[in-house]
């Protein structure tokens, strides 16, 4: 019931407009827009609000109270769109999500599968669109480097595995056929 597609991201404004137009076209449906960084979450959230779209946002930089309120608003259909980092979604069982958009490429197929799987849980058709650009590769490499210097996951084998997962995700995005 999930339909997947990868769209090549050409540039900031063009991608923003593509996401905005998609959300407008699906204004009566619930959806999640995943972004790789808090900065992109805030930018996309403000853009949607600027165009009158009731949206929430969710990332680690928000207070616990604000995250809970936004999550509840989305879960109980007080807002239709959630813009979030991958911090959003654990424990969310909202069955009527019709689309999941990825503004940036996730770090692995496993993350992508988990996040895309939040759509269509009611068995109805849903769409998963990943907007991909070469810039996503650099963003994800920086995030992996930061992760390895800021955590116990600096083990060389863990780093190698993370980079292998990233490379598989890149292959998926760049593949021209099924």
PLM feature segments, named:
Residues 161-178:
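Cys/His-rich short segments
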Residues 1-156, 160-164:
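Helicase motor core with emphasis on the C-terminal RecA-like subdomain
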């Amino acid at each position: 019931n999930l339909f997947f597609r990868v769209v090549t991201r050409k540039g900031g404004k063009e991608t923003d407009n593509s996401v905005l137009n998609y959300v407008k076209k699906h204004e009566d449906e619930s959806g999640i827009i995943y972004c790789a960084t808090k900065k992109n979450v805030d930018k996309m959230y403000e853009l949607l609000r600027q165009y009158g779209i009731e949206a929430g946002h969710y990332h680690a930089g928000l207070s616990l109270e604000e995250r809970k309120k936004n999550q509840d608003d989305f879960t109980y259909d007080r807002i239709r769109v959630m813009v979030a980092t991958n911090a959003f979604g654990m424990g969310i069982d909202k069955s009527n999500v019709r689309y999941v958009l990825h503004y940036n490429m996730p770090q692995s197929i496993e993350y992508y599968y988990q996040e895309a799987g939040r759509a269509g849980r009611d068995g109805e058709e849903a769409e998963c669109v990943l907007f991909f650009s070469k810039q996503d590769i650099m963003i994800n490499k920086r995030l992996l480097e930061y992760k390895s210097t800021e955590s116990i996951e600096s083990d060389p084998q863990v780093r190698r595995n993370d980079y292998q997962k990233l490379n598989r995700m890149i292959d998926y995005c760049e593949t021209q056929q099924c």
